[in-house]
Amino acid sequence: MDSLTQITLGAAVGEVVLGRKLGNRAMIWGAVAGTIPDLDVMANLVTDEISALAFHRAITHSLTFSILAAPILGWLLHRMDAHEGGLRNPARWRDLGVAALAIFILVAGGSLVMPIPSLEILKIGSVVTLAIIFFPLLSTLLRALRGISRPPEQRPGFRLWTWFFFWSIITHPLLDACTTYGTQLFQPFSDYRAALNNISVADPVYTFPFLLFVIIASRMAKTGRPRRIFNWIGIGISSAYMIFTFYNKVKVDGIFERSLQREQIAVQRFMTSPTILNNILWQGVAESDSVYHHGMYSLLDARPEVDSFVQIPKHHDWIRPYADERPIQILRWFSDDYYTILRRKDGRLQFNDLRFGSMTGRFDSETDLVFGFIIEEKDGKLVVTGSDERPDTAGDSFRQLWLRMLGSD
């Protein structure tokens, strides 16, 4: 999900594990730990767009990473607590170096099975490791410059720090797996993308009440009972809303299935997901032999049915000559084969991921789709780049989305 949500979740989890001992420091480190998996986006700085796409929500979002990174970071924070002296203490830099090497081996080694060239993996592993180690490094510098030293009774110790990082990190990919994007929980053993499709990648109803109670908790004494109560209220409200989204998912799946049967549309498979920023308006994509069928349903609709379906031609044969090319294989895997090919006005082909729907409710223009990639040949080589073009009527599109969410008669 979005960064603010993951920061909030990490802070709340950090408070549960170490709040009594560290107070707001636990929330800060929890927010940092909750952000760590998404530092895989740093790959965009050093590699091509398709490799970065494959790497996002991969090893850093895996159960393996949560299990192995936790003791590495737990050991590092434990050692940081124990260090005395200033920046000239060689033990500070030795421990940072050891932890950085261990993280690099975990990130790069765990990515060798991916469809990314080895040199690119080394570059990605390096930049992601630097991003992860930056926060302990910054903390080390600040503590050394300020001469901060905590007595042993205020130090969590290796086991507690490890437990802290495990829960703060693992909750990130588990939450991401509830969205449509897909999360590779089982890397490096499987590239399966877990996607439960029950909540949008950004949902303010989930995030803002949660954030409010975490902020309230942060203003209270670290050993006080009210602090724990408010933090747990935030966790409880967000968890209750998450259960509500699963209920909606089951309900909407049934409505789409019955609506397809009513229209006598024979399909091979279908998927449903909430539209952006809400859990009221849902979209569904169903696949038949040569076309996809797209429909929308709001929980506020007068009747429990999808009133109409739009047919979207597949045109998969247009990229058949490139079927064995790495970029096409990655895009097909990324989209779970819910894709259509569109010929743009400039003659180039565009690969559109249908799971994320349309900005305008239409599917016949290169600017309609939320997630598109331009395919072209340059100097005999296939080049794929993301399309960031948006319709001029984006504001109107959001208004139409809002009106549709309010229901139809």
Kindly give the residue locations of the regions a language model identified.
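Extracytosolic and intramembrane catalytic regions of membrane-associated proteins
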Residues: 266-269, 276-409
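N-terminal membrane-targeting hydrophobic helices
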Residues: 1-254, 258-274
